[in-house]
Regions:
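Short tryptophan-centered beta-strand motifs in secreted/extracellular beta-sheet-rich domains
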Residues: 81, 161-170, 174-176
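Ligand-recognition surfaces built from glycine- and aromatic
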Residues: 193-218
Length: 218
């Protein structure tokens, strides 16, 4: 099957639904190597939900896992996803990667649900994060530009529940909105400008995903 939608999106051999709202990859086929590429993680399916568990022991450091949509190149447009992590301290880091080349070269927007409703206002400002690996890790961005590439989320989502994320990507900017809010919780200058794949992203602990939608720029 060949689908051509715009210069920002090229798909070949991908099981997905294409509509006016964009492309909806079939998450239930995450373990089908013709449709998805799972990197440094184990993926399981429960109905429409994908649970992604990164390899490695979280007690000994960060371990990033990805589930990447095969044969898809994305540069600009809108990404949407429903996510669920955990509210326990350092229980989950989860989000979406784009411009993916490999396990260490990508841009990502990810969330720290355990910071959503933290009693410490400074800690709440770490709820959502943009990175552009390998150069712009969260450590580098926090040290070099504190408070610029991460932010709090208002209104506060349930740290242990499902929440909806919309990520708008242009050549210059990345903006993030949560649960249908018209006010972005994070707007940053884009630090990576590569075309690449789109994927589910986890660090250290398992997370759940559903309803991925990719809407390329017209």
């Amino acid at each position: 099957m060949m689908i051509r939608h715009s210069a920002s999106l090229c798909v070949a051999g991908l099981s997905a639904v294409l509509s006016a709202q964009g492309l909806t990859p079939d998450l239930t086929r995450v373990n089908d190597a013709n449709s998805w590429r799972v990197i440094d993680a184990d993926a399981s399916v429960e109905g429409p939900v994908v649970r992604l568990k990164p390899h490695g022991d979280p007690a000994v450091g960060s371990h990033i896992g990805l589930a990447v949509v095969q044969n898809l190149k994305f540069s600009e447009g809108t990404l949407e996803i429903d996510l669920r992590g955990g509210g326990k301290e350092k229980a989950s880091f989860l989000g979406l990667a784009f411009g993916v080349t490999d396990a260490t070269t990508f841009e990502a927007v990810y969330f720290r649900p355990f910071r959503f409703a933290d009693d410490d206002p400074d800690a709440r400002r770490h709820a959502v994060q943009y990175v552009a690996w390998p150069e712009y890790t969260w450590e580098k961005l926090r040290n070099d530009k504190p408070g610029v590439y991460e932010a709090a989320i208002q209104p506060v989502p349930d740290p242990a529940g499902w929440f909806h994320a919309r990520i708008d990507v242009t050549k210059q900017k990345v903006s993030v909105s949560i649960d249908g809010s018209t006010q972005p919780c994070l707007v940053v200058d884009r630090l990576g400008h590569r075309e690449g794949e789109v994927g589910l992203w986890v660090d250290s602990m398992p997370a759940a995903f559903r309803n991925l939608r990719i809407n390329p720029a017209k």
